[in-house]
């Protein structure tokens, strides 16, 4: 018989009375935790369905589709059966073991410290986080040891998800074994659905503790202690990055285990390794950077594999980056022109996007000179190094028992030149820089509080980025040239490409290219860019530039005036429910939602 217990307040797991055929699972609903008991063998139990559904938000458009793409159904029976087979052993290093149940086991991590000696039956499963790319479940064993089960959303192709999981697990393995960094140990994984859990997954060590983000206050006013407070978050992340940068690789791409890359890629060693146990453990394969998979589900894996590396040169890497975007857009354009697309397409906009990426292809290998005498330590800046795109205090857990920072989430980690790496998002700032409010802003003292806050925001963001650059200079003075405004300007088109999120974001790419025109001749003269001719590589007509400027301004106005545009139309569920209850959010005949302006003015939304 099914029992439900609802608790309001602190999220927690519930213990299960001893029984051989029942399993407890719980899920977080806002500030509530629901606990449900189900029979392990009852795969059709309707009480399970909601356990797999996405609940942390809703979308203004295509809500049902977006939720369906984030459903994380897996075999509870399969997980339970797999856990029973855990046999703790010593930490002797062996190759990843492909098991008959379709999973891959890293048995060197099956230690008593992580698993305990006995009692490996699954006691409970709790949904503890629904992120942007995957969902996190906490699995509690009968001996009260806890594990993390991470399941990706179906936002990308099966090919992309398989590569992503294979690479992330190998990267975690490399960070733990080679660099001795604090990361969760992976016990097992399945890169495809053909395994006992019937879904791609990673099963890893659970780290108990608080997020480092709890200590991050980016808008803390300047004081005697403010810099020290900010550095408590910046410094451990810089320490981690410093260790990432300590290994230079032999090519560009992403890390994989030896057996997960092609025979051709197996022949190329990733870096110079002296430890015989590690020499043939990893190889460099196709890049898992998100730009090679985002919005490319329609492209066949054979087509994408022509462009996603690995590469022996930066120039080829940049050309392929442009090519994969053009190929994807041309495919979409062909479907739209043949009335075969499964979505409404703006044909004119697709053509503009293609033109922008063609422009990027022309200029990509001319942006930065790999042998520039004007760029300090340019050879070091162009060497292949690990880059983690989600280095963030949100992805750092301060372990409860040791107070050591443990780093999590290495999706889309790649090997590329440090000169092309972006700053971590929590410190990066692309706006107008302010270094001294009273000296740079006339009349600042006499402004009202609202106006002051706008300038203070710009100042604090500038300050935080500078603190990151100071930390980089202290750790890797040989790489500090990336802080140059000229380097930032020259690599801006590349960064706009890899960070492109929506179809209209191509305008930011074009704008970054256009902004180089004014300085191009000087960059050529000083040998900073990789060109010997002072003429700008792309010919823009006045008509093209005027149209681009108009389109960009309209897009920026659209983003500024459209509710939830910054989150892609995603609304936190508590807020969504409140707005809907107050008739501020209204559903139309197509199942999409819009803001009812009159209702919003009459009934301002309350805090959820």
Swiss-Prot record:
Superkingdom, natural source: Eukaryota
Pfam families per the UniProt record, alphabetical: APH
Keyword Transit peptide: yes
Statement: the UniProt record of this protein carries the keyword Transit peptide: yes
Cited InterPro entries: Aminoglycoside_PTrfase, Kinase-like_dom_sf, Mito_inheritance_9
Localization per record: Mitochondrion
GO CC list: mitochondrion
Transit peptide (first-last residue): 1-21
Keywords for this protein: Mitochondrion, Transit peptide
Family label: Belongs to the AIM9 family.
Protein name, as recorded: Altered inheritance of mitochondria protein 9, mitochondrial
Species in which this protein is naturally found: Clavispora lusitaniae (strain ATCC 42720) (Yeast)
Upper taxonomic lineage: Eukaryota, Fungi, Dikarya, Ascomycota, Saccharomycotina
């Amino acid at each position: 018989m099914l029992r439900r217990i609802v608790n309001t307040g602190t999220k927690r797991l519930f213990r299960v009375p001893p029984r051989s055929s029942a399993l407890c699972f719980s899920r977080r609903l806002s500030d509530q935790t629901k606990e449900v008991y189900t029979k392990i063998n009852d795969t059709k139990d309707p009480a399970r369905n909601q356990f797999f559904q996405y609940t942390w938000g809703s979308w203004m458009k295509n809500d049902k589709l977006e939720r369906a793409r984030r459903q994380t159904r897996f075999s509870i029976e399969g997980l339970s059966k797999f856990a029973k087979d855990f046999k703790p052993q010593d930490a002797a290093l062996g190759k990843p073991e492909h098991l008959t149940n379709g999973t891959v086991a890293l048995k060197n991590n099956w230690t008593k410290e992580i698993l305990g000696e006995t009692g490996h039956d699954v006691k409970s499963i709790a949904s503890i986080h629904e992120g942007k790319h995957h969902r996190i479940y906490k699995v509690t064993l009968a001996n009260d040891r806890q594990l993390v089960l991470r399941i990706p959303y179906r936002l990308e192709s099966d090919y992309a998800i398989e590569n992503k999981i294979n690479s992330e697990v190998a990267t975690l393995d490399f960070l733990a074994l080679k660099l001795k960094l604090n990361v969760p140990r992976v016990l097992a994984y399945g890169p495809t659905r053909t395994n006992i859990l019937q879904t791609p997954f990673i099963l890893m060590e659970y780290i108990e503790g608080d997020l480092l983000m709890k200590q991050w206050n980016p808008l803390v006013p300047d004081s005697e202690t403010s810099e020290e407070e900010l550095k408590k978050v910046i410094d451990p992340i810089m320490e981690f990055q410093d260790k990432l940068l300590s290994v230079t690789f032999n090519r560009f791409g992403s890390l994989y285990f030896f057996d997960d890359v092609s025979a051709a890629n197996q022949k190329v060693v990733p870096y110079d390794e002296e430890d015989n146990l590690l020499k043939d453990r990893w190889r460099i394969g196709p890049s898992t950077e998100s730009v090679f998979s985002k919005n490319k589900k329609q492209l066949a894996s054979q087509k994408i594999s022509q462009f996603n590396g690995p590469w022996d040169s930066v120039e080829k890497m940049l050309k392929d980056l442009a090519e994969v975007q053009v190929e994807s857009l041309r495919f979409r354009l062909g479907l739209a022109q043949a009335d075969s697309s499964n979505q409404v397409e703006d044909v004119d906009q697709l053509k503009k996007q293609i033109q922008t990426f063609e422009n990027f292809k022309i200029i990509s290998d001319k942006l930065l000179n790999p042998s520039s005498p004007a760029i300090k330590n340019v050879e070091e800046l162009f060497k292949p190094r690990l880059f983690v795109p989600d280095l963030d205090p949100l992805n750092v857990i301060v372990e409860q028992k040791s107070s050591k920072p443990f780093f999590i989430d290495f999706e889309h980690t790649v090997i590329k030149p440090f000169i092309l790496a972006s700053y971590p998002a929590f410190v990066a700032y692309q706006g107008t820089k302010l270094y001294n409010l009273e000296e740079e802003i006339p009349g600042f003292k006499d402004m009202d509080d609202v106006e002051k806050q706008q300038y203070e925001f710009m100042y604090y963001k500038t300050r935080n980025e500078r603190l990151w650059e100071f930390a980089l200079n202290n750790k890797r003075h040989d790489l500090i040239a990336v802080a140059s405004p000229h380097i930032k300007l020259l690599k801006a088109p590349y960064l706009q490409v890899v960070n492109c999120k929506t179809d209209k974001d191509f305008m930011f790419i074009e704008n970054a290219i256009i902004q180089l025109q004014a300085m191009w001749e000087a960059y050529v003269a000083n040998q900073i860019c990789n060109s010997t001719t002072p003429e700008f590589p792309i010919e823009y007509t006045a008509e093209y530039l005027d149209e681009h400027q108009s389109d960009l301004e309209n897009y920026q106005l659209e983003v500024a005036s459209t509710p939830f545009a910054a989150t892609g139309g995603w609304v936190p569920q508590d807020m969504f429910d409140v707005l809907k209850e107050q008739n501020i959010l209204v559903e139309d005949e197509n199942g999409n939602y819009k803001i009812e302006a009159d209702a919003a003015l009459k009934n301002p939304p309350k805090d959820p």
